[in-house]
From Swiss-Prot:
Stated role: Modulates RecA activity.
Location within or outside the cell: Cytoplasm
Family: Belongs to the RecX family.
UniProt KW keywords: Cytoplasm
This protein's record includes keyword Transcription regulation: no
UniProt-recorded name of the protein: Regulatory protein RecX
């Protein structure tokens, strides 16, 4: 047997991506806020000015939208059992202003008290908390999840006839 030289590798050559391409790659996976996208680009070694320009370009072309991002966060967190206080705080960490946060919270079409009741039913069964200790645990759970006092009070009272 004769030895042959290994065939040259035929693969894709790596081309350096532009800041816009890097940002678009992040946006394809999931929505990002402008602040979050800018921070991620800078963490990947892109100059702050180039990162900001890329984010602004994608926002101008409709690829990035803070309102759409915020509405998506509200929808996802509400369906995961989080309350309005938690969601507002999370949106604030993404660098959204109070107007965008309020607009996103207004897109929620459900009832926060009903969401709290659903969460309690999932954790404590259909009958809900039966004694005072379980009611306290349920109230603590709802408070940790970011529900307001009124929703907690109504959800932990748990009168099925009401």
């Amino acid at each position: 047997m004769s030895e042959q030289a290994p065939a040259p590798k035929r693969g894709r050559r790596f081309k350096e991506q532009t800041p816009v391409q890097r940002a678009l790659g992040l946006l394809v996976r999931r929505e990002h806020s402008k602040k979050e996208l800018n921070r991620k680009l800078q963490a990947r070694g892109i100059e702050p000015e180039a990162a900001q320009a890329a984010v602004e370009r994608l926002a101008g072309e409709g690829w990035q939208d803070d309102v759409r991002f915020a509405a998506s966060v509200v929808r996802n967190r509400a369906s995961s059992g989080y309350g309005p206080l938690h969601i507002r705080a999370e949106l604030g960490t993404h660098g959204l202003d109070s107007d965008a946060v309020s607009a996103a919270m207004a897109t929620f079409e459900g009832d926060w008290t009903e969401n709290a009741l659903d969460l309690i039913r999932r954790r404590f069964g259909e009958d809900g908390p039966v004694d005072l200790a379980q009611r306290r645990k349920a109230a603590d759970l709802l408070a940790r999840r970011g529900f307001d006092g009124n929703s907690i009070r109504l959800a932990t009272r748990f009168d099925l006839e009401d």
